[in-house]
Amino acid sequence: MLMALNPGTDAPIFMSIPHLSLQDARHLQLAAQGLLTPRRAKAKPADLLATIRRMALLQIDTISVVARSPYLVLFSRLGQYDPRWLEQLLAEGDIFEYWAHEACFIPREDYRLLRHRMLDPAAMGWKFSANWLATHQQEIGQIIERIRQHGPVRAADFERKGEKGNGWWDWKPEKRHLEVLFTAGQLMVRERRNFQ
């Protein structure tokens, strides 16, 4: 039994604790994720946005065995659809990319729910480094100016100086600059090309 106080009188309100069987809990989770909803005969672009809204976000995972993970997640809910619709949603601003545990596509209307993270990026752990930002102010300023003058950039637009990197996390400085600016909400992803 749970007890709460009535806001008007401070009198106790007793509530019973809801009980879900394991089967009901599983069913509830599958339904919330849209996996129990019958598919349309043919998916439409609006269905893709509705699906992301229903899930609240779509994790961006670059692992690809059959296809990139986000495409498989959408296929499991929509069936056959045009993968370019996801890029169109991003380009049109219906979804945005940001950290929600990991990198995710998130409906535009939920931007306000994550803005506090952008305003306090130091709480984001490895995804942000105030020390990096301070140490590389000049180079970061040059990247921002380049974007202002010439438009969006990708980390791939910058050549690695010196030896080739040796692993997933051996990022060239420009990639790290862009990631820090992204985490601080100073840059947003406008589009992806080949999932970059």
Model-identified regions with their sequence ranges:
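Long, low-complexity intrinsically disordered regions
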Residues: 4-7, 12-196
